[in-house]
Amino acid sequence: MASPDWGYDGENGPEHWCKLHPIANGNNQSPIDIKTSETKRDPSLKPLSISYNPATAKEIVNVGHSFHVNFEDSDNRSVLKGGPLPESYRLRQFHFHWGSTDDCGSEHLVDGATFSAELHLVHWNSAKYPSFADAASQADGLVVVGVLMKVGQANPNLQKVLDALKTVKTKNKKAPFTNFDPSVLLPSCPDYWAYFGSLTHPPLHESVTWIIFKETISVSAEQLAQFRSLLANAEGDKEVCIKQNYRPPQPLKGRTVKASF
């Protein structure tokens, strides 16, 4: 999905995305600032059922604006069910967003507060669509689980991922990344918010049911620095660190944010 026509600063930055992607000003854009006093508890929201098989972890790829850990998604070995979802959704990849300093980096805010980073686990509706690409633009196509990350203690569960970054230092590099269960990165408290929104970078499809955990996970300053050491350039080109890769919050435009708690 990465293309040279967008980025996170200057004339390619988020406020200019609408020139090439008019949906950037749509009614269901993400991320948002979750105002807790305006969320609605929904008793019909069931607990999430998350079942990830570590054998489906496949590779890590530098996509130029972040890195993706990709999963084998030709079967239902790694799926998300329950919560607000009518179907089971298959895990495709996870990635992170971060900032140039420790006091920013998350895409979602809670009552105006920003966090140091954010983990996104991307799933697609395999019950209804033949592939991730087919699902990605459909209103019921995707579910992204978001986990807010707060600077503090080092998080040992992140270490395997961070250690792999040196194998994909530059854009388009990929390396095997196997035997990993990303549920170790989830908070222990099951409470979450849910709302309908979009991908947070171009093509910005309004195709995402968002599930944002209330509880944060920790990440240390040193671990955040490892994210920022990743390079946006291809091998041999002038070195440019990926210092920040988050989109500012978008207007809610009448949407309801539901709470499971």
UniProtKB/Swiss-Prot annotation:
The keyword Zinc applies. Its EC number is 4.2.1.1, 4.2.1.69. GO terms for cellular component: cytoplasm. It is an enzyme of class 4 (lyase). GO terms for molecular function: carbonate dehydratase activity; cyanamide hydratase activity; zinc ion binding. Keywords: Acetylation, Cytoplasm, Lyase, Metal-binding, Zinc. Zn(2+) binds at H95, H97, H120. Residues 22-41 are annotated as: Disordered. Gene3D superfamilies: Alpha carbonic anhydrase. It is found in: Cytoplasm. Residues 4-261 form the Alpha-carbonic anhydrase domain. Inhibited by acetazolamide. Substrate binds at T200, H201. The active site is at H65. PROSITE patterns: ALPHA_CA_1 (PS00162), ALPHA_CA_2 (PS51144). Catalyzes the reversible hydration of carbon dioxide. Can hydrate cyanamide to urea. This is Carbonic anhydrase 1. The gene is CA1.
